[in-house]
């Protein structure tokens, strides 16, 4: 899928507005150097067939990569492990990644490698779906209004089903896409908030099912509906269009979106090897500029979203029916068949500082890794911040973003004035507030999960 005529409209970079960087609390050192031509003009970027690969697709289809002097090849990957491995071994220059992947790799959970990110690709975008059988057992216990279930639906209701199955000796199984995926942590968060233990990772149980009430396993996103239809799993957490696909096929019902679990949660990032970023700083900034522009374009109008849906429906990208993709991408979400509700924030690509890599977002993922045993021992608050600063690169983001401000492509007000931390965040389904500066205090608030010196 290499773009033809890639030499068209190549542009040199300009420096950003240093005063804005200072106001944002970002070091000026990284911003003072004027980026030059890309060190590497021909690059290959990987993605998984999900609607939130949209910034990559839009940057390619709208010519934003070309504008930055890049000849980009986009390549779909079979699953998240293959994608990560190919970035690590250099077959891919960078990729659409789960927000937890650079962090997990850096701390050595699974494959050990130094992966960094300077760009968040989107906020929200996932949902939890259950099979028709499970939905039929849950529905009688739901509060109703106007003949429809009251949302958000909490896992307390699912617990009744799981407890009944447990008495019958039947295991309850659900799918998620990868051990360090947002989906894994969101599903675990929702289950635990409803009194269900989603299990722990241990040295002898790397599947994460120790002491579990609900058995979670990995299934690639496009295979989720078929795996549930076959009865291998009874529900799953995944990105779009694979929840809406279950509705379209009549095999399942989404019960909650991740926006209802954690408001404005960061979902995917653009990840590269740390060595690659050091060797190709101008190329890295060029990619970031193109993707920031793509995010801005995606959130600029409904007409743009509709155009993006058509792009994503192509076989080389998501390859799903445009109507199914459009359900969530254009601000609605269908739960039970015919129960279509407004969901204007289901996919956010630029608003709410969606592209900025906040340290506090990184630390939240690390707290969940500790909560479920992927981090096996107690760590001081300073450790969480040190890892976040090693992996998340807001100063590189600001260099790219300020260049776009100087070029008149985005506004200075589109960028946050921040030291890398959001304020205390509420909007979680269990009512627990999160302060990224106090990760251990945050962990202490949960009834289910490891904290302090706990071990499984």
Model-predicted regions and their roles:
Residues 33-217, 227-264, 430:
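Short, glycine-/small- and polar/acidic-enriched structural segments
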Residues 363-456:
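Conserved C-terminal helix/tail region of periplasmic/extracytoplasmic solute-binding proteins
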Residues 279-395:
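Secondary-structure end/capping motifs
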Residues 202, 222-333:
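Pocket-lining segment of extracytoplasmic ligand-binding domains
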Residues 20, 32, 372-376:
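Hydrophobic alpha-helical segments
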Residues 2-21:
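N-terminal secretory signal peptides and thylakoid transit peptides that target proteins
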